[in-house]
Amino acid sequence: MVSKEKINRINELARIAKERVLTKLEEEEQQILRKEYIEAFRKSFRKQLDNIELVD
């Protein structure tokens, strides 16, 4: 699971990107954080799907 601080930073970088162009370092940080978030989401979602049991 991604920490609350990292999610807040992702959102902060998104707000900054709407106001101005991100620096190279900010862009790299944003890509890394987004990748980490998506990997955690997929892992969690996959776990939920694996626990689903169909009943007829």
From Swiss-Prot:
Any Pfam family hit: DUF896
Subcellular compartments: Cytoplasm
A GO CC term assigned to this protein in UniProt: cytoplasm
SUPFAM superfamilies per the UniProt record, alphabetical: YnzC-like (SSF158221)
InterPro entries: DUF896
The keyword Cytoplasm is assigned to this record: yes
Keyword Nucleotide-binding among UniProt keywords: no
Keyword annotations of the record: Cytoplasm
Xref: PANTHER family: UPF0291 PROTEIN CBO2609/CLC_2481 (PTHR37300), UPF0291 PROTEIN YNZC (PTHR37300:SF1)
Family under the similarity heading: Belongs to the UPF0291 family.
Name of the protein in its database record: UPF0291 protein Clos_1191
UniProt organism field: Alkaliphilus oremlandii (strain OhILAs) (Clostridium oremlandii (strain OhILAs))
